[in-house]
Amino acid sequence: MTDNSKIRVVVGMSGGVDSSVTALLLKEQGYDVIGVFMKNWDDTDEFGVCTATEDYKDVAAVADQIGIPYYSVNFEKEYWDRVFEYFLAEYRAGRTPNPDVMCNKEIKFKAFLGYAMTLGADYVATGHYAQVKRDENGTVHMLRGADNGKDQTYFLSQLSQEQLQKTLFPLGHLQKSEVREIAERAGLATAKKKDSTGICFIGEKNFKQFLSQYLPAQKGRMMTIDGRDMGEHAGLMYYTIGQRGGLGIGGQHGGDNQPWFVVGKDLSQNILYVGQGFYHEALMSNSLDASVIHFTREMPEEFTFECTAKFRYRQPDSQVTVHVRGDKAEVVFAEPQRAITPGQAVVFYDGKECLGGGMIDMAYKNGQPCQYI
């Protein structure tokens, strides 16, 4: 039996059930485990309760239960500078960012990893649903989590080989239901705590209200592609490509009863374009350009390959051909895709392996840019 007692693993503990079970499993496997709670946002809910304080209490309770030391570290400045400023800049540019991808890259697996090293860590571990597998050459491959509905490799797609070399994902081979069962069997304080949703580290806020605190909204016209005025929009930043709800136009306009969707944005004229039908022609594209292209293991500077890709979380994979040129790529779809959204991540897969990805800049239909920014 392997003796893990001399291997120190620092676990990022959020106060949720996933990271609690992560720490428990590592402790049971004999590792030298330390729990660390990251405070990344100065957060008070509508009742005046600082949710981070409540979460830290849960971390402390679980750490005491399983018998590990625990600490709290403050990354509010790093989060603001590296994630939140990016988040706001993307919205200013009319895009729809994915802060969770950047949060993993810059906070959980950079700032936190650096802090863990000061504690003498050999590895860090988190409660993400993903797997790491080392090949005979020592290269680490990141694989999808066994629970297809919970797989989080999409959000981990910007991690480097160096980061993956130092990372463990103890939940990767488990189903979410099994994780809950483990927590309940062990009587963990977080066993019945509901999963958090919402923006990475910001939680379940009213998004429109939250965003308006930082970016002034500029109302403008809502138009169809052929120029019909459909009323007023509340501010381009509040809408994303393919969005159905919140338009306030129902079925009263147009000759049929199909629902209305956001099909494009014109940032320079502050126009929101809408159209009827889930598969409205303006929503369909057959290629995209992406930047910040990054692979989880070493790849050539310029090459072309076929793989599958996701353009948003929880969507089925689509077959694509990727033409890589440095940190940029053209991604050509085997079948037309709906609502490709600038600012979101495109993530590449080879079977179970997540190869990496990039950020979507523009979608194209037959070589012509879609009216998305």
UniProtKB/Swiss-Prot annotation:
It catalyses: S-sulfanyl-L-cysteinyl-[protein] + uridine(34) in tRNA + AH2 + ATP = 2-thiouridine(34) in tRNA + L-cysteinyl-[protein] + A + AMP + diphosphate + H(+). It comes from the Bacteria. It holds the Pfam family tRNA_Me_trans_C. Keywords: ATP-binding, Cytoplasm, Disulfide bond, Nucleotide-binding, RNA-binding, Transferase, tRNA processing, tRNA-binding. The record marks 128, 344 as: Interaction with tRNA. Gene3D superfamilies: Adenine nucleotide alpha hydrolases-like domains (2.30.30.280), HUPs (3.40.50.620), Translation factors (2.40.30.10). Residues 150-152, 312-313 are annotated as: Interaction with tRNA. GO terms for molecular function: ATP binding; tRNA binding; tRNA-uridine 2-sulfurtransferase activity. GO terms for cellular component: cytoplasm. Disulfide bonds join 103-200. ATP binds at residues 12-19, 38, 127. Signal peptide: none annotated. The active site is at 103 (nucleophile), 200 (cysteine persulfide intermediate). Belongs to the MnmA/TRMU family. Catalyzes the 2-thiolation of uridine at the wobble position (U34) of tRNA, leading to the formation of s(2)U34. This is tRNA-specific 2-thiouridylase MnmA. It comes from Streptococcus pyogenes serotype M18 (strain MGAS8232).
